Regions:
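Glycine-rich active-site loop/strand segments that organize a redox cofactor
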Residues: 56-88
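Mobile, glycine/GP-rich and aromatic-enriched active-site lid/loop segments adjacent to catalytic centers
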Residues: 93, 100-157, 224-361, 429-554
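N-terminal Rossmann-like FAD-binding beta1-loop-alpha1 element of flavoenzymes
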Residues: 11-36
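Long, amphipathic alpha-helical stalk/connector segments used for oligomerization, subunit docking
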Residues: 384-466
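Core beta-strand elements of the Rossmann-like FAD/NAD(P) dinucleotide-binding domain
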Residues: 6-9, 176-186, 340-341
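Glycine-rich loop(s) and the adjacent beta-strand/alpha-helix scaffold that form part
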Residues: 186-240, 360-380
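Conserved beta-strand-loop-beta-strand element in the redox core of flavoprotein oxidoreductases
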Residues: 160-181, 187
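Glycine-rich FAD pyrophosphate-binding loop
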Residues: 29-49
Length: 554
């Protein structure tokens, strides 16, 4: 027997990472009744348990906003949305102080120490480090303290829409054959980044593009997905995040720290042209922000061994299906984190703010951006909801969505979601598809993904609630892959973490712009959103000075 529950509130928050927790807390502070749903466990959701620092901007201790913005604008290759970049910087100290007041302990920072400039030029603060397990506990306790109703281990699968407005969602319990209906005057998607369940990056295992897929299906605009994330992982233990313990073989050959980054053959790795110098006065520090390991694969020279005190062989492609922080997700319809569909908001990695543009511009900015947009979205959604009258959602609208949600478990036969996911991974995984891009290869992959979308996804079947969840995750990942490939084809230039072998140069005349995705008459349509001219770089400055990083083929 299928159990069905209906839960009502003013604001529904989907996702329990730092963005979702901030959204729920701030909505509650506006006296809204808040429901919070997470596929995992609120506080420990998504990538939040893996984040360990937050940037903290404070002019009172010598920070200069123009310096910070100038660095990020150039590092982002001029396609950052400067409104959201500035917002994440200015609100970072407030977020930092708030987390302190909630009991989170940060590691001490010496603002005068040269160590603080390791990841950014002088004048930019070293990010404040903390223990992620402490943050998870503090966030959850604060959400509970605010009176938010938490539902762990529930996957929201489809949004409810009535009279052009999102009015809640339908979800599935992961532990039972239970369908849940959430009625809410405003819904905030905080479901994190996208991924295709890669083996090499555990933070993505539950982040399967659910938010943007649901939003796309109700008509929301989605940000382009061409700027890929380039996290790497260890060869010997792909599922480990970070570089822990040197292998005995490498230690015997090279010692624990040979003092440089090198190939597994022992040849020294020359990073020239594949880095941004961040301490030009010394020339001793640099921050990799591009496709370094993918470009080495392209040249046939992987794996490399990272220069650390615990060297390991590394390969790229760990975060398959993921974009840069804040470089995909729902397109913001305004500065309140609303989407382009009434009643629907987003925050964190689910909101395409482009605060970092085409690269990950500054360590610690991800947490600041997630917390600040969560706070903005929560406040705005609560005010929106409290300004409405009574909300009545028709049974017909609910039942239609429920039938779609349960369709795979009603199928008597079809395709296993695990098998379809493996097909998708095999299609998208090669470095020469997702990272080193060229139109003929992208079109070939897009043809396969379109076939999967049209012929296999409608026939996904599930034998139990666990497999039903997998079916919805697979459907969402396939849709995201189609968006990713079409975005890569659409941007006919190279910039930041988007490298087109057939267009290896930046094209400022045509591509100082963002791409957007929307469903129109059953088709996926991509459009350009021009970047305001006042945010453009000075085009009179020589190309080589505007863009210090060189792509192969330039």
């Amino acid at each position: 027997m299928i159990a069905e529950n209906r839960i009502e509130g003013d604001v529904l928050v989907v996702g329990g990472g730092i963005a979702g927790c901030y959204a729920a807390i701030k909505a509650s502070e506006q006296s809204a009744s808040v429901i919070m749903v997470d596929k995992g466990y609120v506080g420990k959701s998504g990538q939040t348990p893996y984040a360990t620092s937050i940037m903290a901007f404070n002019p009172d201790i010598g920070h200069n906003l123009d310096d910070w913005m100038s660095y990020i604008n150039k590092t982002s290759e001029y396609v950052n949305n400067r409104y959201w970049t500035e917002c994440s910087i200015k609100k970072s100290w407030e977020i930092y102080q708030e987390l302190l007041s909630w009991g989170l302990q940060f590691k001490p920072v010496d603002e005068e120490s040269p160590e603080q400039f390791k990841y950014a030029p002088k004048g930019l603060s070293k990010p404040r480090g903390y223990a992620p397990d402490e943050l998870a506990t503090i966030l959850r306790n604060k959400v509970i303290e605010c009176g938010v109703k938490i539902l762990d281990r529930v996957m929201v699968t489809e949004l409810l829409k009535q009279d052009g407005r999102v009015v809640g969602a339908v979800g599935l319990s992961i532990d039972s054959d239970e369908t849940l209906t959430f009625i809410a005057k405003a819904t905030i998607l905080c479901v994190g980044a996208c991924g295709f369940k890669p083996a090499g990056y555990p933070p993505l295992v539950q982040l399967t593009c659910d938010g943007e897929a649901m939003a796309y299906r109700v008509g929301a605009e989605i940000g382009g997905k061409e700027f890929v994330d380039t996290h790497y992982t260890r060869v010997d233990i792909p599922g480990v995040v970070g570089r822990k313990s040197v292998s005995p073989e490498l230690e015997a050959r090279f010692g624990r720290d040979p003092g440089y980054t090198f190939f597994a053959t022992g040849e020294k790795y020359n990073a020239e042209g594949n880095r941004i110098d961040i301490r030009p006065e010394n020339g001793s520090e640099y921050f990799f922000t591009y496709l370094q390991l993918e470009l080495e694969a392209y040249a046939g020279r992987t794996p490399i061994v990272w220069h650390t005190d615990r060297a390991n062989e590394l390969v790229g492609g760990a975060a398959l299906g993921m974009s840069l922080r804040k470089a995909d997700g729902l397109w913001p319809g305004n500065t309140d984190c609303a989407s382009t569909v009434p009643g629907l908001y987003a925050a964190g990695d689910s909101l395409c703010t482009y605060q970092n543009g085409a690269t990950y511009a500054l360590i610690g900015s991800a947490v600041s951006g997630s917390a600040s947009t969560g706070a903005i979205a929560g406040t705005a959604a609560a005010k929106d909801a409290l300004g409405m009258g009574a909300l009545v959602v028709s049974d017909d609208a609910i039942n239609q969505v429920k039938n779609n949600v349960r369709a795979p478990i009603e199928h008597k036969n079809g395709y296993s979601p695990r098998w379809v996911t493996q097909l998708l991974q095999n299609t998208m995984m090669p470095y020469f598809i997702s990272y080193i891009k060229k139109e003929d290869r992208l079109q070939a992959a897009a043809t396969i993904v379109s076939f999967i979308q049209e012929n296999l996804v409608p026939c996904l079947y599930a034998r139990d609630p666990h497999e039903l969840r997998h079916a919805h995750e697979t459907k969402n990942m396939v849709l995201s892959a189609e968006m990713r490939l079409k975005s890569a084809i659409f941007r006919t230039e190279s910039r930041g973490n988007h490298f087109r072998e057939d267009y290896p140069r930046r094209d400022d005349a045509n591509w100082l712009a963002w791409s957007k995705i929307k469903e129109e008459n059953g088709n996926m349509k991509l459009t350009k959103e021009p970047i305001p001219k006042e945010w453009w770089p000075d085009l009179s400055v020589p190309y080589e000075e505007r863009y210090p990083f060189r792509f192969p083929g330039e």
